Amino acid sequence: MKCLERIGNQLLRGVMYHNSAADLFDFLGLNGFYKWQKHQAMDELDSLYYVKHYVMKTHHMLLTIDGSAETPTLFPSNWIGKSAMDATPAEITKAVQSALADLVIWERDAITIYEGIMEETTSSDAKKMLCELIDGSKEEICQIEKLQLKLKSTGYNMMFVHYLQDSYCEKYKK
């Protein structure tokens, strides 16, 4: 049961993390990246609901989630209380580059956490859930790294970043 609580807590942190990324991209007017990260947050939330439902139906208990985790932020601290119009193109470029790098780190850390839980659990259902979560994080890392390569090849040219938004909007429209 403890491993399921740890999975649930990690998923909740994931929801908050991807929500922070969505907020950053929304603030910057990068609607495609916003929809992408909103989609990722909803995927994490769906997984959290699945784990909670599994615990209720299998163990007839409520899953204890620690909601006191600090809300992560991908916003540069000097942007708090400012308008997006105050950000220079160089600051926006740096924020996008930094956010993507942070997302890769986040997903790698999630994999490490899930692998650690996998070593501790004997439940085949929990192991199956963990394998799916690990695979999802690996896919996300691949997607982000491909995007980073594209952007790096253009020097993180903001015209190209804006050009990409339509394809991300199309991919993640609901």
Q: Regions from the language model: what does each represent?
A:
Residues 1-174:
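Iron-associated oxidoreductase/ferritin-like identity signal
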